[in-house]
């Protein structure tokens, strides 16, 4: 893909009032040539008949384009791959989802289309029971599927223990982030994240400078669910991000599993 088209697709994700559904509609309407919308903003009524003036007006966006140019320069300097949804390296499982990101930023060595990919999620307040499950299950999984990639969200609790268990068993593991690749949140996981770029990778749809705000974690969860064959919940209370991920996985018609919990354990109240 030419750099200008990549730039414009990234800019499309940053425009106000478009959203992911609208972005996909515009991508289809232009047959994958989003650049024409930015190159000829005053002619959008001819390019896409029926487009509302309000939507058309946001494509006159030089500041957005400048910011996205800076982001692509940042990516190049930091060995970050920018993947659009029609790139061969873009996760094919995720591409099947209606709300798949138009652009992903990826730093790592793992094939995002590996034959077997499993997502593991759970509470941020992991118990010894949950930590033990992570270590034992991932070890047994390696014996069954030596090429499997473990995906999680690099958060406290089950997420980080799943990543570390995979690394300990010399397996590839990918962390999906709720912010840009200019930082690691939480910062105490930087060392693990650095290891993962050499044995797995870090993946996000967010540009650098993006804060790890609450709504970004929900968006992150759909990538965790969509990139894998199945999602496994280790520990979770009645509510939480891991259950949101499980619900998203089911909406994508992906397999979803949960480990049985201990009686009267508040972190074992899930029913899938």
Stretches with model-predicted labels:
Residues 1-143:
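Short, positively charged patches
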Residues 1-3, 84-270:
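Glycine-biased, small-residue-rich flexible motifs in mid-sequence functional cores and linkers
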């Amino acid at each position: 893909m030419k750099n200008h088209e990549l730039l414009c697709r990234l800019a499309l994700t940053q425009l106000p009032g478009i959203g992911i559904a609208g972005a996909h509609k515009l991508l289809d309407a232009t047959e994958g040539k989003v650049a024409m919308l930015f190159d000829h903003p005053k002619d959008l009524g001819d390019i896409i008949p029926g487009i509302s003036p309000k939507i058309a007006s946001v494509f006159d966006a030089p500041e957005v384009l400048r910011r996205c140019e800076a982001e692509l320069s940042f990516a190049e300097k930091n060995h970050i791959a920018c993947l659009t949804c029609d790139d061969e390296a873009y996760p094919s499982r995720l591409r099947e989802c209606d709300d798949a990101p138009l652009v992903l930023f990826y730093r790592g060595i793992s094939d995002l289309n590996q034959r077997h990919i499993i997502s593991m999620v759970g509470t941020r307040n992991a118990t010894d029971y949950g930590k033990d499950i992570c270590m034992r299950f991932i070890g047994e999984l390696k014996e069954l599927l030596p090429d499997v990639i473990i995906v999680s969200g690099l958060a406290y609790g089950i997420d980080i223990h799943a990543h570390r268990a995979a690394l300990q068993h010399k397996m590839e593991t990918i962390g999906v982030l709720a912010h840009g690749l200019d930082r690691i949140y939480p910062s105490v996981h930087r060392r693990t994240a650095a290891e993962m770029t050499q044995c797995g990778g870090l993946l996000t749809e967010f540009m650098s400078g993006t804060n790890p705000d609450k709504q970004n974690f929900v968006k992150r969860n759909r990538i965790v669910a969509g990139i894998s064959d199945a999602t496994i919940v280790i520990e979770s209370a009645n509510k939480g991000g891991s259950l949101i991920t499980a619900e998203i996985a089911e909406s994508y018609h992906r397999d979803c599993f949960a480990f049985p919990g201990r009686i009267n354990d508040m972190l074992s109240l899930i029913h899938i």
